[in-house]
Amino acid sequence: GKVHALWVGAQGVATPWLLSTDADTRHAPDLLARAHAAAEERGLDAVSLAGVQEVRGAGENLLVPPVFALLDALLGDWEEAAAGRGPAVANGQFILLRREAWEACGGFETVRHVPLDDIAVAARLRAGGFRTGFFRASGLRVRMYRGWGEAFQGWRRNLGGLLGARHGAVAAALAVLLLPVAAFLAASVSGLAVEATLLWIAGVAASMLLRYGSGHRPAWGFLYPLDALALAGVLALAAVDRRRGRLLSWKGREMRV
């Protein structure tokens, strides 16, 4: 798989930096130079980037932007993340590694059996006393999944690994997602047209703002409350999968979350 290819490719490399990036990403011409400059200026041993996630069609727009709004909220302060003081986070679509630091932590062989190897890379570097930074980057673009089915299965796997053990965070996210929807549905079935309309408008406005903040088209906010229900469903299933140690199939392989 990818980690094995990275391990093979890194053998005998004498350059001071290693770049791990996905083949389906598109980079601005100066992206690598800017990432390297940020690492040198801030004294970082790894720089990872969160790029623009491209989505097409209703299925992808239903789920992907809300997922990234959730991840953005959980990350917290982006300035702290960029300075290397936030959580140990990395995005496998772009990780620039100081070779000596990564080799001191054991290299790619140490994350060969980990489902979320990018997060594991950041965690190992932090555990070894090294500094990792996480940045937003409009110069990195990628379309992660094709259609609703891929997006659903992909984020079920990813969220299981990222959040499955954080029961408090999962419960809080589900409450934020589902309580307004429950209020809207209750008002609708009770014939409270004005209240239901106001709740729907508030939900659409919130969805639009979150989409705008993550670089996606705000007009898809009119999918509310379907987008909130979709995210809640994927998040709940991811948490259950993690609790049960369930095996999920991904690209022909079974992976335990």
Outline where the language-model segments fall.
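A conserved hydrophobic position in a structured secondary element of the catalytic/binding core
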Residues: H27, L97, D117
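Long helical/loop segments within the catalytic core of UDP-sugar-dependent glycosyltransferases
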Residues: G1-Q11, T15, R34-A104, F152, ...
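Membrane-embedded multi-pass helical conduit in multi-pass membrane proteins
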Residues: V170-R246
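A short, glycine-/small-residue-rich helix N-cap motif at loop->alpha-helix starts
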Residues: G1-H4, R26, V114-P115
